[in-house]
Amino acid sequence: MKHLIFTALFLLSYTVAVRAQIVFPTPNQVEMQTGNLILGKKVSMYAEDTTAFYLNLFREEVRSHTPIKWQKKEAKADICWITDSSLPPEGYRIKIHPQQMVISASDKGGFTYAVQTLRQWAAGSAGSITFACASVTDYPRTQWRCF
């Protein structure tokens, strides 16, 4: 009986530890890092285009009912949305640090896929949302995305 309880507790702790790593479809590259980014009731964001639809999608999917304060400088924002033309079409890179998250994408499609990854990556609790620190890079492996 002791072995059964020990095994059950071990497996439970393992599933909790890898919770933040489960994203479907699996990104091309995921590098886990130590720490978490915890977003509370107030979130500041920086974006080159504050009217982009993927920002509304992010708010609906991940941070609903949270007031957003827009920043004019990247360094002051909790979350930064940056266009990076060096990424392939529909590609994105997410870098999550304990103090800031930077989402880079080549185009609006890439930002949309990044939001879907963040939706799965987020762990919510009372009044806050937590993201495990990591670097995630993804882009289509073929001409079109599919499961």
What residue ranges belong to the model's regions?
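Bacterial Sec-dependent N-terminal signal peptides
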Residues: 1-23
